[in-house]
Amino acid sequence: MKFRPLHDRVVVRRIESEEKTKGGIIIPDTAKEKPQEGEIVAVGPGARDEQGRVNALDVKVGDRVLFGKWSGTEVKIDGQDLLIMKESDIMGVVAA
């Protein structure tokens, strides 16, 4: 199934964090926090301003982004756990 977000929404796939610390300690699932980093999988066309013009989003498909701990709505699409959030929930793009 193809999913196209509307307006200024984006679809993000979480990037899983390491299961081991640098010292070699394995972190159990119960102690892990959900990662706050992800990859943009789909973007909407942008938000409309008062004149009805569409303002394109600053992020694009493939960007690695950081977002807040409670940002977005969790959904499952084609068996993948994804987040749908507004562009304003994204704190920044991680430089490659």
Curated annotation (Swiss-Prot):
GO biological process: chaperone cofactor-dependent protein refolding
Entry-linked SMART domains: Cpn10
A GO molecular-function annotation: unfolded protein binding
Lineage: Bacteria, Pseudomonadati, Pseudomonadota, Alphaproteobacteria, Hyphomicrobiales
Signal peptide limits: none
Keywords, ordered alphabetically: Chaperone, Cytoplasm
Protein name as annotated: Co-chaperonin GroES
Alphabetical list of Gene3D superfamilies matching this protein: GroES chaperonin
